[in-house]
Amino acid sequence: MPAAPPQHLSGDAASAGAWLGACAAHWRQTTVLLLLAGTDTAAVPGISAAGATPESRRWTAAADAELLLLGPAAERRHALPPLPAGVSPALIAHGVVSELGLDPLVVDLGAAVAPAVPHLQLGQAPARCLSSGQALEPARVRQLLALGQRWGRLLAAKGPQEPLLIAECVPGGTTTAQAVLTGLGLEVAGLVSGSLLEPVHVLKTELVERGLSAAGLLGPGGMGGPDADPLAVLAAVGDPMQALAAGLVLGAAGAGRPVLLAGGSQMAAVWALALALCSPASRPALARQVAIGTTAWVAAEASSDLALLLQRLGARW
């Protein structure tokens, strides 16, 4: 796999080149994890295009997993709901993993409907709507984070130079991403992308402020404070995918394994959680092992700004 630079780069070009170079010799051994989860935030009318209606969004994660593993020509139990914004990213991902000969592992952390393909079942119920300020039980957050850290360390011990690719499908997840980023003290309103052609920034921000306020985490300027407890923020307004993925990053990248977070705003929230949870002294080494990769559509989306979001994240940590 050529170590070519991405089309759009946010961050240091030399660091990106070094990360790509480190992965180039071992990309055929990449571990691919697709993390499925659910949040009742997806039932808010108008919040997402990952399914045309709140009811259809219940099986979007299952449909994405089945499309990724089986492909568009196969008979699948859960047909992908109509998507007003266009083609599912799962179709693109299927083409990529098929071409590269990679074998994704699907992990269900609490999707509303389980996928009808082989998968690892770690799920409970979907998270509550983030506007409640009680999205997840704190014990569940701690359990998923610890599980991710142990799993990440095991993967690093098995293949320290083999890349780990973490992908997700969480309908409503860009809103939980905005909520977590905001709760951690980042000004990201209007910067977060979504599945809709025109992200509903006002609705997202209203839900985020309601959730953080209900949890007692809303500070001046509509954000969390600089010393916000990341686990408290995650329990208040996050989703299960974020907890496990942050643990995987800390465990795998912390042990020196390259990690690619495949996504946009949702993976920015995972990365922010990982940085907030690790010590300042360990952040530079962690950052050398982690990259976020997304599609050109997300990177260049006119109605959001992932590059600016990542710049603010980098300035914060």
State what each model feature region is.
Residues 1-167, 171-317:
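N-terminal loops that bind phosphate or other acidic moieties
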